[in-house]
Amino acid sequence: MNQMNPAFVMPDVQSTVDTRQIPIQRVGVKAVRHPLTVCTESGDVQPSVGVWNLDVRLPADQKGTHMSRFVALLEENRAPLTVERFRAMLASMLEKLEAQAGRIEVTFPYFVNKTAPVSGVQSLLDYEVTLAGESRDGHTRVFLKVLVPVTSLCPCSKKISQYGAHNQRSHVTIDAELAGDLPVEALIRIAEEEASCELWGLLKRPDEKFVTERAYENPKFVEDLVRDVAQRLDADERVIAYVLEAENFESIHNHSAYALIERDKRLAA
C-alpha cells in the first residue's frame, strides 16, 4: 500500500500566480444535486432535493479557485433553509474561497397541501422554486423565484360566444428581490388569487364544476393577469424589486400568449 512521505507537501496549484492577468467574473460548480430541507410558512420542515450553482469572482493574478470548497459548503449547511440562513451561507462561501464577490442559486420542487373547494379532499401540488443570492463589494441581494401554474380564461372568447369560452393552463413566474424573510406560500397565494382560477392536484366532480364556473366568472387576458399580480407586489413592502411573467398556453393556438412587467421600487422612490 502506498504511503505518503510526511516530509512531502502537496502543491496548491490553484493558488499559484497566473501570468495572463485576466480576471474571471464567475467560476465554480454547476448543477450539483444535493438534499435540503425548507422551512414552511406554518413552521414545519419540508425535505426536497436542490440543484445548486455556486461561483465566485476570481482575481486576475490567481490561477484557479478551490472547487472542493463549494461542495464542502453544502455538506456543512444541513439546517432548514431560510432567507437569513441563505445570506449567512453566501457570506461563508466568500470567506472560504477568499473572494470579494460570489453567487449561490438553488432550484427545488416545493409542495403545498391543498384542500379542494367543495369536496374538501386534500392533495399536494408542486411548485418550482429558486432561491438566489449574490454578494459584491460588501452588498448582498437575495431573490426568491416561484413558478405558479394557474388557469386563465379569455374575456374576448366569453364575450363573443353564446356559451363557453376557451381556457388554458398558465404559468405565472414571480422573481422577487427581498427586503426580508418572505414565505414561498405568500408569492404562490398572490399568483393564484389573481388568476381566473387556481389549480389542485385532486378534484371530485363537484370541485370540477366549481373550478369551471369560477374561471368563467373571472376571465382575464394575460395582460390582466400580470397587472393584477403587479399591484399586489407593489403593495408588499417585503418585495424591493421584481420581474413578473405570465405565459398562457393557448388552447386554440399552437403558440403561447406572454406578458412581462419589471419594476425596481428603489428607482421610483
From Swiss-Prot:
Enzyme class name: hydrolase
Disulfide pairings: none
Annotated GO MF terms: GTP cyclohydrolase I activity
Catalytic reaction list: GTP + H2O = 7,8-dihydroneopterin 3'-triphosphate + formate + H(+)
Coiled coil: none
Gene3D superfamilies according to UniProt: Urate Oxidase
Record keywords: Hydrolase
EC number per UniProt: 3.5.4.16
Annotated pathway: Cofactor biosynthesis; 7,8-dihydroneopterin triphosphate biosynthesis; 7,8-dihydroneopterin triphosphate from GTP: step 1/1
Gene Ontology biological process: tetrahydrofolate biosynthetic process
Pfam family, one: GCHY-1
Annotated site residues (May be catalytically important) in this chain: C154
Family membership: Belongs to the GTP cyclohydrolase IV family.
Protein task: Converts GTP to 7,8-dihydroneopterin triphosphate.
Protein name: GTP cyclohydrolase FolE2
Gene that produces this protein: folE2
